[in-house]
Amino acid sequence: MKKIFLFLICCWTISASAQVQKVNLQASGLTCAMCSKAIYKAVSAISFVDTVLVNIEASTYDIRFDKETTPRFDQIAKAVVDAGFSVANLTVMVNFDKQAVDKNGLFTLDGIQFKLMGTPLASLQGSKKLQLVGKPYMLPKDLKKIPAAQLGNVASNTYLVSLK
């Protein structure tokens, strides 16, 4: 009985920590391969980042994390800005397992609070893409396209997201 209990605890721990799979970052303001390299170095230096795969033509970066850490998306965006560039898009790939969402669209994932824009859902299931909304996760011209009412009041420790 002890072995079964320990096995179940291990399985639960593994599934809970593996929810955030990766981040896809699209940068803006790049003009050459050296620009891509500057962002690569800045993002790779973040303590919780495991690997960074670069697509120079699309100016995108697939970022994977150390399994025992919680990613901080604000630190990723700050690294890009500190390198002298802008974040055009930051999309988080998440594997949900019946994730509860409250009536205000709030849910917590790996200790990180999110607010879902648009129609509130009761739960999230399966693999989903969450686009981070707001400054510094998108370009100002794209942010202006979102009605202010949809942005609403969001706590400073909460990420505003939309399903992609």
Region annotations inferred by a language model:
Residues 1-21:
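Bacterial Sec-dependent N-terminal signal peptides
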Residues 56-108:
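Mid-chain, structured segments of secreted extracytoplasmic proteins
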Residues 85-162:
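Thiol/selenol-based redox catalytic cores and closely related redox-interacting motifs
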Residues 22-53, 59-64:
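Start-of-domain marker
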